[in-house]
């Protein structure tokens, strides 16, 4: 992992709203022993992540491909001269507060969720429908609450009766008071109940040692998680 050197070290990460990408970033920063460094992490909309990497503002972008969004993102990546590398597949889960009427269910259908507000990260106006972080965004819903930060999501889940769909990876701040339940995805076109998590790097970017350390830490953070299936590179 990262060791100190006399040069000014730099690591810049652009990521969707996932705690594992933040955890890996913090662990790399804590391990670095150099005298001069600049570490930057941006939690962004999907389009901003692609643009950050395209313009070299950030060295790496962390994002998720769903069965629906991948159709658009697979075209957007080469258009931006970025290359996507998968890290792991994660099982989709429904997240609700422990007080929620559905909290004790063993499995949930989308019909079960129909009367409850759906929480999602807002993606702005450009390609927002296709750039969603949450799976099954293409399925219409009559109650929507959108926001831009993970803190609001945690607050909503613990204090209200809505839900969100995401990977089965709970962040540390979401362990208390929040329940994850697998959804029944049978009958959903093009869905196998998983999301592909990976990273993008500009095709002309030369990877720094710190960037390599960060990628290794991402793999380590998720290696023992029972809800993910890592890719071997």
Question: Where is each model-derived feature located?
Answer:
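Short helix-loop hinge/linker segments at domain boundaries
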Residues: 1-14, 30-34, 77-84, 229
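Central regulatory/effector-binding core of bacterial HTH transcription factors
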Residues: 8-72
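Short, well-ordered beta-strand segments
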Residues: 10-16, 61, 95, 119, ...
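Secondary-structure junction motif
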Residues: 21-27, 70, 110-139, 207-208, ...
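Hydrophobic hinge/microswitch elements
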Residues: 54-59, 123-181
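Short secondary-structure boundary segments
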Residues: 65-66, 98, 125, 166-170, ...
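Beta-alpha-beta core module
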Residues: 79-85, 90, 151-206
């Amino acid at each position: 992992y990262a060791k100190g050197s006399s040069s000014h070290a730099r690591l810049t990460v652009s990521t969707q709203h996932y705690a594992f990408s933040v955890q890996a970033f913090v662990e790399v920063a804590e391990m670095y022993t150099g005298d001069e460094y600049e570490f930057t992490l941006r939690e962004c909309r999907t389009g901003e992540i692609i643009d950050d990497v395209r313009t070299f503002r950030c060295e790496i972008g962390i994002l998720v491909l769903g069965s629906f969004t991948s159709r658009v993102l697979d075209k957007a990546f080469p258009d931006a001269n970025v290359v996507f590398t998968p890290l792991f597949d994660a099982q989709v889960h429904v997240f609700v507060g422990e007080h929620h009427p559905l909290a004790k269910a063993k499995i949930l259908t989308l019909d079960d969720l129909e009367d409850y507000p759906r929480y999602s990260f807002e993606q702005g106006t450009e390609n927002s429908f296709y750039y969603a972080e949450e799976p099954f965004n293409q399925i219409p819903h009559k109650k929507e609450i959108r926001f831009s930060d993970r803190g609001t999501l945690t607050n909503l889940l613990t204090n209200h009766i809505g839900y969100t769909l995401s990977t089965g990876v709970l962040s540390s701040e979401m362990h208390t008071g929040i329940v994850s339940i697998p959804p029944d995805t049978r009958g959903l076109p093009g869905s196998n109940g998983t999301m592909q998590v990976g990273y993008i790097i500009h095709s002309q970017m030369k990877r720094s040692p710190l960037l390599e350390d960060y990628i290794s830490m991402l793999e380590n953070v998720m290696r023992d998680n029972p809800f993910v299936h890592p890719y071997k590179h």
